[in-house]
């Protein structure tokens, strides 16, 4: 069994102001994505300035935050937030939905693309290889918050999470780290290597949806579902898995469509 590192969820406290690691991980993810997007910018569109890229990152970040929070409210705990709507604003306590954030990003990309002469999938293909940086950083934030841990297990790398998080004090799968490894590291490598060569429009977006859906679906088997939802069917199907099914199907369809439709402008390769 591995010891769980005792990390205060509050990274910095200045009087009543508290800066949480969870929030800092979002900044790390957004900053890392912006840096890598800057590296690809000239190949994506030589006419784009760093200022336009910053605008894109800003609006996509708003899509992640607003969509992620509202997605969690709608998909995972609607009744609690209806009873106490002010909880919606307590983002530092966790409660963000990737699938809600994904919808928020798509809406932001659709709006931004129309204003800047880019199609939806041109922007999504450009952005997709950077998204795993934010996903990985977010999973580290979950780990520091001691939330979203896995089922009890006797594997050698099991961890006992703090009593405030897990009163049962059982050795558990560190499922946040599994997701960091798959959704962060592995997905980044797949997309970065795949996009190094010119690809037809929609192919990179399809690869993102397909592999994120597969990785998340797999980890859900060892991750404890949200207490207010539990398993939806068969004592193993979770809300996360249900939401991943359309991503997997949609990803496969986009990849098929990208390679079978009439030729279109390919996504710019990665440097």
Swiss-Prot record:
Cell compartment(s), UniProt: Cell inner membrane
Gene Ontology CC terms: plasma membrane
Keywords in alphabetical order: Cell inner membrane, Cell membrane, Membrane, Transferase, Transmembrane, Transmembrane helix
Single GO term (MF): phosphatidylglycerol-prolipoprotein diacylglyceryl transferase activity
Topology class, membrane: Multi-pass membrane protein
Pfam families named among the record's database cross-references: LGT (PF01790)
Primary localisation category: membrane
EC nos: 2.5.1.145
Superkingdom of the source species: Bacteria
GO biological process terms held by the UniProt record: lipoprotein biosynthetic process
HAMAP family: Lgt
Homology family: Belongs to the Lgt family.
NCBIfam families: lgt
Protein name, as recorded: Phosphatidylglycerol--prolipoprotein diacylglyceryl transferase
Gene giving rise to this polypeptide: lgt
């Amino acid at each position: 069994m591995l010891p769980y590192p005792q990390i205060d969820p509050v990274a910095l406290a200045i009087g009543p102001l508290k800066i949480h690691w969870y929030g800092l991980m979002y900044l790390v993810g957004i900053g890392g994505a912006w840096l890598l997007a800057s590296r690809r910018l000239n190949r994506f569109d030589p006419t784009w300035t760093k200022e336009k890229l910053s605008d894109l990152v800003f609006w996509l970040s708003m899509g992640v935050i607003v969509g992620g929070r509202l997605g969690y409210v709608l998909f995972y705990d609607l009744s609690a937030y209806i009873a106490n709507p002010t909880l919606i604003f307590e983002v530092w306590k966790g409660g963000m939905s990737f699938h809600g954030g994904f919808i928020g990003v798509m809406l932001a990309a659709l709006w931004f693309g129309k204003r800047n002469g880019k199609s939806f999938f041109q922007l999504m293909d450009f952005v997709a290889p950077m998204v795993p940086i934010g996903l990985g950083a977010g999973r580290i934030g979950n780990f520091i918050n001691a939330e979203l841990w896995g089922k009890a297990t006797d594997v050698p790398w099991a961890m006992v999470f703090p009593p405030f998080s897990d009163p049962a004090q059982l050795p558990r799968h560190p499922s946040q780290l599994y997701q960091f490894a798959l959704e962060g590291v592995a997905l980044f490598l797949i997309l970065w290597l795949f996009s190094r060569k010119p690809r037809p429009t929609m192919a990179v977006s399809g690869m993102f949806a397909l592999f994120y859906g597969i990785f998340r679906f797999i980890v859900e088997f060892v991750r404890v579902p949200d207490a207010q939802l539990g398993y939806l069917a068969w004592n193993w199907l979770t809300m996360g898995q249900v939401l991943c099914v359309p991503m997997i199907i949609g990803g496969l369809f986009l990849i098929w469509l990208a390679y079978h439709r009439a030729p279109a402008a390919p996504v710019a390769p990665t440097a």
